[in-house]
Design a protein with these regions (language model features):
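C-terminal flanking helix
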Residues: 14, 18, 39, 102, ...
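Structural recognition of an alpha-helix C-terminal capping motif at a helix-to-coil junction
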Residues: 19, 33-40, 44, 53-65
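Arg/Lys-rich amphipathic alpha helix in sigma70-family domain 2
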Residues: 48-50, 61-80, 139
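A short, charge-rich alpha-helical start-of-domain segment used by transcription regulators
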Residues: 1-19, 23, 32, 106
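A short pre-motif secondary-structure segment
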Residues: 108-112
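Residues within helix-turn-helix
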Residues: 29, 120, 131
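DNA-recognition helix of helix-turn-helix
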Residues: 64, 68, 126-150
Length: 154
């Protein structure tokens, strides 16, 4: 992949990177720093990408590591997903319900339903088994259903 094509590809994925960082980091500036660091590392390590088909997964993995680095440095727990993380036309309570999910369940749900990643891509990005991704998504969907139905009758 040429440098120009690589740059075009990562620029095209920048919005996705910001949305994924929303599911992990709380502070807007921390999210911006994590995405910036991700893009910088990706550029420096672009020659280590073995297969162009996995560029998106590779970038997400770098981003997740950067987000965890921010957590480690700030010792902060994720507590907020901005409204933009919810898909257009989504139930307004979805944002609040997503906030109630633990990060390990929330991240695969955001990657799959809001960013369109496959189970396999999520498993590669999070470095977990595809079965674990499915299990976390199943548990997350059940919890979301429970939370959203509770709000409906409140």
């Amino acid at each position: 992949m040429t440098n120009e094509r690589f740059a075009e590809e990562i620029i095209a994925l920048t919005d996705t990177l910001y949305r994924v960082s929303y599911s992990i980091l709380r502070d807007k500036y921390d999210r911006e720093d994590a995405v910036q660091s991700c893009l910088e590392k990706a550029w420096k390590k672009r020659r280590t990408l073995r297969d162009e088909r996995y560029l998106k997964t590779w970038l997400i993995r770098i981003l997740i590591n950067e987000c965890y680095n921010v957590h480690r440095h700030k010792r902060e727990l994720p507590q907020e997903i901005p409204e933009q993380a919810a898909p257009p036309g989504a139930d307004p309570n979805l944002h609040d319900a997503l906030m109630c999910l633990p990060e390990e369940v929330r991240t695969p749900i955001v990657l799959h339903y809001m960013e369109g990643y496959s189970i396999h891509e999520i498993a590669l990005a999070l470095r977990i088994a595809p079965g674990t991704v499915k299990s976390r998504m199943r548990n997350g969907r059940a919890k979301l259903k429970e939370l959203l139905s509770e709000e409906e009758y409140s």
